[in-house]
Amino acid sequence: MSGLLAAAYSQVYALAVELSVCTRLDPRSLDVAAVVRNAGLLAELEAILLPRLRRQNDRACSALSLELVHLLENSREASAALLAPGRKGTRVPPLRTPSVAYSVEFYGGHKVDVSLCLINDIEILMKRINSVFYCMSHTMGLESLERALDLLGRFRGVSPIPDPRLYITSVPCWRCVGELMVLPNHGNPSTAEGTHVSCNHLAVPVNPEPVSGLFENEVRQAGLGHLLEAEEKARPGGPEEGAVPGPGRPEAEGATRALDTYNVFSTVPPEVAELSELLYWNSGGHAIGATGQGEGGGHSRLSALFARERRLALVRGACEEALAGARLTHLFDAVAPGATERLFCGGVYSSSGDAVEALKADCAAAFTAHPQYRAILQKRNELYTRLNRAMQRLGRGEEEASRESPEVPRPAGAREPGPSGALSDALKRKEQYLRQVATEGLAKLQSCLAQQSETLTETLCLRVWGDVVYWELARMRNHFLYRRAFVSGPWEDRRAGEGAAFENSKYIKTHLFTQTLSSEHLHALTHSLYTFITGPLAEESGLFPPPSNVALARCCDAAGTLPHQKAFLTSLIWPGIEPSDWIETSFNSFYSVPGGSLASSQQILCRALREAVLTVSLYNKTWGRSLILRRADAVSPGQALPPDGLYLTYDSDRPLILLYKGRGWVFKDLYALLYLHLQMRDDSA
C-alpha cells in the first residue's frame, strides 16, 4: 500500500511542480487544452483518493499522506486559477503570508496562546508539545495540531521551493538537535550550540548544478541554432573569460632569444632541452600570446554574467517570435531583478551559485590587480619558476665555458663593499619583505573568500521542501490518535469507586507501605520512568537506539526546557526513596490535576507517573507477580489483540486500563486496579 501511495505522490508532485511554473508564465504561452485535460484527471484522482486519505489520516498518518492531501488540494486551486476566465497577463505573487493565532489547552484549565507565522513556528510548537504531551488529552492535542496542519498546507502551496520569507535557517530543528547531541557539549545544553548551526532540514539545499548551456541546448534542439550563431557573431570580441596568467612576456621572449643559437646541427645540453620543452608545452597558454593582460583579460566576471543574461534574453525573444509569432511577457520579464537583486535570486540563464563564483573571482582579481601582488603571483607560478631555473643553469653553463680563470669566492653572507652593495642588500630585503606580506595577504584572501563564498552559497542556494515538519506532525498526530483509539475500546468501566473499591485500594496501600524497593533496581526504574515522560518524537527504532535519559534530554533541549525543570525530572527518584514518598493517600484521583499553571500541572503529572512506575514494581516484588506497565500509544489502531498489562493512557478521565486475556477494565485508582489483578489466578500479564 505504501508503494501505491508513493507512486500517486510522485505523479501529483510532478503536476504540482508544473503548475507552479505555469502560474508565472504568460497565459498566451500555455496549452489550454492540456491544462483542462490535466485538471479533469486531477479532479478524478482527488474524488477517488482524497476521501480515503482523510479517513486514513484520522486513524494513522504518515508524512507522505499528510503532504499528499495538501498537494491535491493546492493543485486543484492552482488549476482553477490557471483556467480563470478573467486571467490576463502575469500576476505578481502577493507579499502577504498566511498566519494563525490560537490557544493550546492543557490539563488544569491552563491555556497558552501561540502565534504561527513561519514554518519554524510550527516546528517549534511540535517540539514543545512533544515535551509536555502528558499534560494534554487526546482531544486537546488533536485540536492544536489540526490548526497547525491547516496552516502548513497553505504554506506548502504547489511549488517545490518554499517561500524564503517563511523560514529561518538559523533556528535548529528537531534533527539539528539530534546531530548536535552527537558532539561533546561540555555540559551545556544542545540549544546553546544550536545558535551557530544552519538548519538544512526544513528547507533542504539542492546541490548546485551547471545552468550555463542548458538554454542553448534547448534552442538547438528546437532547430533555432542559427539565432544563437547570429548572437555570437554580433558579440564583441575579447579575451576568454577566466584565462589564467602564465609567465610574462619578458621571460618568454628572453627564453626564445636564448634558444635562437641552437639548431639541428648543434649539441643540445640538458638545460636547453628542458627550456625548449617548457616553451613547447606552454605554447597553447593564453598569457604567452599577444594580449599579456591579467586574469579574465581585465573584464569583470560578474559583468560578463549579467551581459550574458541580456544577450540570451534577446535570443529568447527571437525564439518566441519564431515559434509563437509574438514576444511573450512572463513574470521574470514583468518584474526583472536589478543587478544587486540578481546576486540573491540568480537569473533565468544562471544560478545564484554562478553569481557567487563570479563575485569571488572579481574580488580576487581586484586584490591581485596591485602591481606588487601581480609580480609576486607571477613568481609563484610553476612554469615561471622552472623557466627561470632553466635559463639560470643555461647562463651558468655558458659563463663557465667562456671563463678562463675562476674568481676568488667570497665568504657566505658577505656583500660587495661600497654604496652599490648596501643598495643591493636593501633592495633584496625590501623584495623579501614585500614577498612575505604578499604571501600572508594571499593566504588571508583565500581564507576570507572561501569563508564568505561558503556563507553566500549556503544563504542563497536553492532550497526545496524538507520532510521534517510533516514527519513531526505525523508522529504527534499518531500519538494522540493511538491514545484516542485505545481509550475508546470496549473496556469495562470501574471508575465509579464504590465502597468495596475503596477497601481494596486501602488493602494494597497498607501492604505496600511496609515494603521497600531494592536499591539495585532504582537505576533501572529511573530509566523506566524516563520512557513514560519522553515525547513521541524521540521514539526512534534502530540497531543502536539512544538510552532513555539521552532521549529525554533531547526532548528537553529541543523544547527549551529550563535548567531547574530538568533538575526536577532527575530528582523524581533518589536513593533510599520510601513508599511514603510516592504513594498518594487520596482515593480514585489518579492523574487528576487541579487548576494552576502548566509548570505545576507538569510536576503533579510527573509524580503520578512516578507513582505508577514504582508502585507496580513494588507490587510485583511483594506478591511475586509480573505485571508490565505499558504506554497506550504503543498500540496501533489496527492491532487485533494488545498484549496484557497495565496501560497508561495519559487521559485524565480514563488514566489506567488493565488488559488481561482479551478483557479490559478502566480505573481511576491505581491500587484498586492492582487488587483486581491480584485476584486473577493465572497471571500472565
From Swiss-Prot:
Compositionally skewed regions (Basic and acidic residues) per UniProt: 395-407
UniProt key word Transferase: no
Record-given protein name: Tripartite terminase subunit 1
Function: Component of the molecular motor that translocates viral genomic DNA in empty capsid during DNA packaging. Forms a tripartite terminase complex together with TRM2 and TRM3 in the host cytoplasm. Once the complex reaches the host nucleus, it interacts with the capsid portal vertex. This portal forms a ring in which genomic DNA is translocated into the capsid. TRM1 carries an endonuclease activity that plays an important role for the cleavage of concatemeric viral DNA into unit length genomes.
Family recorded in the similarity comment: Belongs to the herpesviridae TRM1 protein family.
Main location: host cell
Gene Ontology biological process terms, A to Z: viral DNA genome packaging
Any one Gene Ontology cellular component term annotated for this protein: host cell nucleus
Family annotation (Pfam families): PRTP
Assembly mode: Associates with TRM2 and TRM3 to form the tripartite terminase complex. Interacts with portal protein.
Chain residues that bind ATP: Y619, N620, K621, T622, W623, G624, R625, S626
Start and end residues of each stretch annotated as Disordered: 231-254, 394-423
Zn-finger region bounds: C3H1-type: 173-201
GO MF: ATP binding; zinc ion binding
Keywords: ATP-binding, Host nucleus, Late protein, Metal-binding, Nucleotide-binding, Viral genome packaging, Viral release from host cell, Zinc, Zinc-finger
Subcellular location: Host nucleus
